[in-house]
């Protein structure tokens, strides 16, 4: 008799996606992050659901409701810090996942890649709105500054900002709608993840060499299920250590001060995972120019397949491109550092130089290096 997992209409889909799925035999640990992101999303939806049961999205009570969760709800402090630090873990995995895609040429699967970019934007929007909900000082002023950027759009900008705010400033209407969207968007993310996997399973996974691996495939279970569980244990160890030993390490102390529209914090900044984009935004003196640079810093990923001029897909055998890739990583870390610093000399010029280098490496140096490497192959 045929195994039920291969015949049952529902189990068959799961079987073909996670059990009998043919996978390349040489996938490294860099291929673990997809499953880790799935776990992060599940953790965020579950902890968020329980937090939403106790949270109130009203400017008068939002801050106190978060305090109530931490002090009075059974394990409320654990839920709150798992959710806050789970977001950080989500973005760490997300950036490593994108980095893996850039390094090994996974962006050549353009449908999967484009859905991934859409996922990135959706997750960023969700995280931004979630940061507003505790209604601390940084929540309020972060929401004010970031939504205000839309006023740079010619003609409709000011009306658009007031439409999003639901008034003439960030207030009760803004908080209520942000809570509604913050609750809704993770389910959209989950739906997009399904589409992401659908397109991935149309082509099959890439592998570190970038060479087609059709002739040497192994079943996903047990080989990669075990490998994913190991990665999961490492990630959960890191997350639980962060939550239990240093839960406020990645947060901003200003967010423990209730939101006050009459008192501006000395340094308004977003969460650490947005600092690189924030640094690029600030490095351009013009408001509209800064907003465009901010959007393009992420949208540039969409043209990566067009900028791929190398005859080899992966960077595994391309040492010059590898050097540029790691330089890009260093620049992104520099931008993250600059985004958290005040707007003064020498941080301004460092941020501007790093921003120029970020775009130059992706748009100019990487394609030129690929052409040079193609030429060297002929020797």
From Swiss-Prot:
The keyword Plastid does not apply. Binds 2 heme b groups non-covalently. Heme b b562 binds at residues 83, 182. Pfam families: Cytochrom_B_C, Cytochrome_B. SUPFAM superfamilies: a domain/subunit of cytochrome bc1 complex (Ubiquinol-cytochrome c reductase) (SSF81648), Transmembrane di-heme cytochromes (SSF81342). CDD domains: cytochrome_b_C, Cytochrome_b_N. Heme b b566 binds at residues 97, 196. One of its GO terms (biological process) is mitochondrial electron transport, ubiquinol to cytochrome c. Belongs to the cytochrome b family. Heme 1 (or BL or b562) is low-potential and absorbs at about 562 nm, and heme 2 (or BH or b566) is high-potential and absorbs at about 566 nm. The cytochrome bc1 complex contains 11 subunits: 3 respiratory subunits (MT-CYB, CYC1 and UQCRFS1), 2 core proteins (UQCRC1 and UQCRC2) and 6 low-molecular weight proteins (UQCRH/QCR6, UQCRB/QCR7, UQCRQ/QCR8, UQCR10/QCR9, UQCR11/QCR10 and a cleavage product of UQCRFS1). This cytochrome bc1 complex then forms a dimer. This is Cytochrome b. It comes from Glyphonycteris sylvestris (Tri-colored big-eared bat). The lineage of its organism: Eukaryota, Metazoa, Chordata, Craniata, Vertebrata. The gene is MT-CYB.
